[in-house]
Amino acid sequence: MDNSMKNIFRQGRLFIALSLAMTSISAFALTQQEVDDIIKPLMKQEQIPGMSVAISVNGKQAIYHYGVQSKQTQIPVSDRTLYEIGSLSKTFTATLATYAQIQGKLDFSQSVSHYLPELKGSAFDNVSVMNLATHTSGLSLFVPSDIKTNDQLMAYYQKWLPDNEVGQYRSYSNLGVGLLGIVTAKQLNMPFSQAMEKLMLPSLGLKHTYIHVPKSQEKYYAQGYNKQNQPVRLNLEILGPEAYGLKSNAKDLIRYLEINMQSIKVAKTWQEAIENTHTGVYLTDSFVQDMMWESYPWPVSLSQLLQGNRDDMALKPQKVELIKPAMAPEVRAYYNKTGSSNGFATYAIFIPEEKIAIVMLSNKWIPIPQRITATYQLLEKIER
């Protein structure tokens, strides 16, 4: 990556040809039919039982529901329907970490072993908290299947050695964000699930977002379906709460994205915590790696989004460059995050300058390109 590419990102301009001309938004102008024309063919093609799409433009929300929560019960999808949001959960974990930072309890430049003495003398003497928050620790994607307890997990971390120099490669990692959650919870002096469910989520006004779905809400928890159309549900294993464990509905998630765009104001500390997750720390070949969010200069083409969300980005280490100094949160940017579990698919985007946010939720796993393409088609219709 050369300096010219970095400059292009800094100036917020496109570095590849733009596939369409974007115009400013005058009003919320999507009809039900326009959304149907994009979502219904996708559902048919991918055999999706149920979907929700929430859109916010200039502070005005519209939520569209399709199909059923479960093929067995045939209960229609509604505002209350809960979906597994997979790795979109990682942005919540990053926000909890930046909250701890604002409280003076966490320093992102410190080594991980500074906060976890049991890891002193390990590779984590040279891994910073920021490395965990930006997928640049070198830790692998999945927790090894034989690790079932915290003691086993810590033993794994103690022995772990990176394959590449820390901070030189982006390796998308549940083990990394999981460890970020462990460090954050320790510094906040409460279990991670408690910090998320009792401290952060209520502070953001997210009343139907959970790690553990309460009994009273179980009837709204959609049944997920895998690639083979078999019913599946998330089994929360170790580091699940920190890395991919949240369930939420379209209404809560569009609120979360509106908070990210400052369309909705929350307490100053939490607004600052959310804003800090938009800091640009590393440059990949396609996007800026923020703290779990990924951002692109706006306007952005569909081809660039597909390139940045290609499978290799999650499955193989990618060379990155540290941005010095880190980029302040960019308003003229397209922020996105995918989320998946075996039976659910999520895609969330927001563009602060345009005050547009979209979240797409389905109770079947579908390929990422299909999610991005459908979302981009919605965006084109909003922006026409």
Curated annotation (Swiss-Prot):
Q: What else is known?
A: The class C beta-lactamase family has a specific amino-acid numbering system known as SANC, for structural alignment-based numbering of class C beta-lactamases, or else the simpler name structural position. A multiple sequence alignment was used to derive a consensus sequence and then the consensus was numbered taking into account insertions and deletions. This allows use of identical numbers, e.g. for active site residues, despite differences in protein length.
Q: Which residues form the signal peptide?
A: 1-29
Q: Matching InterPro entries, A to Z?
A: Bact_CellWall_Synth/Modif, Beta-lactam-related, Beta-lactam/transpept-like, Beta-lactam_class-C_AS
The record's family statement is: Belongs to the class-C beta-lactamase family.
UniProt keyword DNA-binding present? no
**How would you classify this enzyme at the top EC level?**
hydrolase
- EC number(s): the record gives 3.5.2.6
- Residues that, per the record, bind substrate: 337-339
Q: Name one GO biological process term.
A: antibiotic catabolic process
Q: Write out the catalysed reaction.
A: a beta-lactam + H2O = a substituted beta-amino acid
The principal localisation class reads periplasm
What are the UniProt keywords, alphabetically? Answer: Antibiotic resistance, Hydrolase, Periplasm, Signal
Function, please? Answer: This protein is a serine beta-lactamase with a substrate specificity for cephalosporins.
User: Example GO molecular function term?
Assistant: beta-lactamase activity
Instruction: Give the matching PROSITE patterns.
Output: BETA_LACTAMASE_C
Compartmental location: Periplasm
A Pfam family found in this protein is: Beta-lactamase
Protein name per its UniProtKB record: Beta-lactamase
| Active site per UniProt | 87, 172
